[in-house]
């Protein structure tokens, strides 16, 4: 049984809701998942010891949240090459953050990424619950 770390950055609670649903999908597949607010990640050691990493941020003014940018610099020092990865985010008008996180994880960290980033306006709209849980299941199938 593998372990996944899901780190999220958001203000309204929507990004956390998506993170929790992704974790449910991972657990349905029989793996462990820890959901952590970005404010709890302060050092490289906070990111070590997992088989999969899923990073998510809300998009504000076309950008990921500053806490996620800072955490990605820490993650770069963690040695994530070859680890399973995914990205997600909630947005109101535009959804650039999940794609930028995904590109960083794939091209800089050289991670084994799942299909693509998960971008939802809300976990509760348009099948969002199923999409987020399905994303978690897809991640769990890779490790």
Q: Locations of the language-model features?
A:
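Cofactor-binding loop segments of dinucleotide-utilizing enzymes, especially the Rossmann-like FAD-
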Residues: 9, 38, 90
């Amino acid at each position: 049984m593998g372990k996944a770390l899901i780190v999220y950055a958001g203000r309204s609670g929507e990004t956390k809701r998506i993170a929790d649903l992704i974790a449910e999908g991972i657990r349905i597949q029989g793996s462990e998942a820890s959901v952590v607010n970005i404010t709890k990640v302060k050092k490289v050691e906070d990111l070590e010891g997992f088989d999969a990493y899923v990073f998510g941020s809300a998009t504000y003014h076309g950008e990921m949240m500053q806490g996620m940018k800072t955490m990605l610099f820490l993650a770069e020092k963690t040695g994530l090459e070859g680890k399973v990865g995914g990205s997600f985010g909630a947005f109101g008008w535009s959804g650039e953050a999940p794609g930028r996180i995904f590109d960083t994880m794939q091209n800089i960290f050289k991670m084994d990424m799942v299909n693509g980033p998960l971008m939802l306006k809300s976990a509760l709209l348009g099948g969002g619950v199923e999409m987020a849980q399905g994303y978690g299941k897809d991640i769990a199938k890779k490790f």
